[in-house]
Amino acid sequence: MYVVILAGGGGTRLWPVSRPDCPKPFLPLLGDETLLQRTVKRVAPLVAEGDLFCVTDRRYGQLVRDQAPDVRLIVEPSARNTAAAIALAAAVIERPEDEVMVVLPADHWIADEDTFRSVLSVAANRMAWGAFDIETPLVTLGIRPTTPSTDYGYLRPDTMRGSRLDGVPAYPLLGFEEKPTDARAKELINMPGVAWNAGMFAWQRGAIQAALEKYTPLPMLIGQATGSELALAGAYDRIQPISIDKAVMESAADDRRVVMGSLDVGWSDLGSWTALLAGLGGGEAGGASGRVVQRGETIEVGPDDLVVRPVDGRLVVESGSAVAAGTGGTIAADGVWAHLAGARSLAAEVHAMLDRVARQENRP
């Protein structure tokens, strides 16, 4: 078994903290370690030395080297979403066809790391070797939903055929659903076994290579170019950005080639200010919510709100009362802000997070 961590992305829903030059995986949002460092530490006990890899594009190669020097780095010429990143890893990491590749995002938060490792081990050592009459399936790990969220895609399992595999609930997967409407999310969360799609996978190297060859041109484009940086850059110029879900997993589920393992580990992708506030609050946002405000946008700011904005080249957090003083509560943003509604009780936590980020960015 070897683990491939995918690190990149603009993290635009967390601006102005997460920016293209230093996106979410490389920030210490919920402690002194960055999300990438926490991910590496979380999975390191499962693999031998030399079996932990990170795929990122050339903008972030040095950040990975600095933050995770023991991880073996695979650098993409440019960002082309997860399908290309996984295809590149499958091509360049030379392992036996039946060795299991685990794929994880670099920027997720997991509270119960022991249970996470246990489930991941079952996915790699049991599920990926065959289940529900599927030989060498593609395994995806689904998160037990806690709210009818419209921020995530959903996984629909065949609960009639599900069972526990080494203690982990597992099912053949019927299909994927894109981020739903409010009404559809409320329907989905009441369906047995339905899970959030978290982008975590386990599969034999040969299984994902065969699936990529069946559903995409990526192995042909990338496989012929891995020996030269120039050739690989040219191949990437011809690749359209597409997720592994769209490129492979949805079709594989239609062909009944996917198994879902169920995770209940206190998970968050920290993909929005609302999710980050919940993380800063120890798992509860206390009714607070947040969103990115664009330059020139007019917003209503209340006394229980916070605003994160750049002032004199640094990010500061200010109370709604201070920001909107003398305006009657209505103000136009003079840059990219974060408006954190009802977050006054989390002011100290937001201050501390901004201080950690500033120290990280100022390191030599």
Label each PLM-derived region with a short phrase:
Residues 6, 45-47, 93-96, 102-103, ...:
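Solvent-exposed alpha-helices and their adjacent loops that cap or buttress functional pockets
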Residues 25, 38, 42, 63, ...:
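Alpha-helical scaffold segments in soluble metabolic enzymes
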Residues 36, 89, 107, 155, ...:
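Residue-level signal for inorganic ion chemistry
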Residues 112-224, 229-234, 256-257, 325, ...:
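Conserved core of the sugar-phosphate nucleotidyltransferase
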Residues 203-364:
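Left-handed beta-helix
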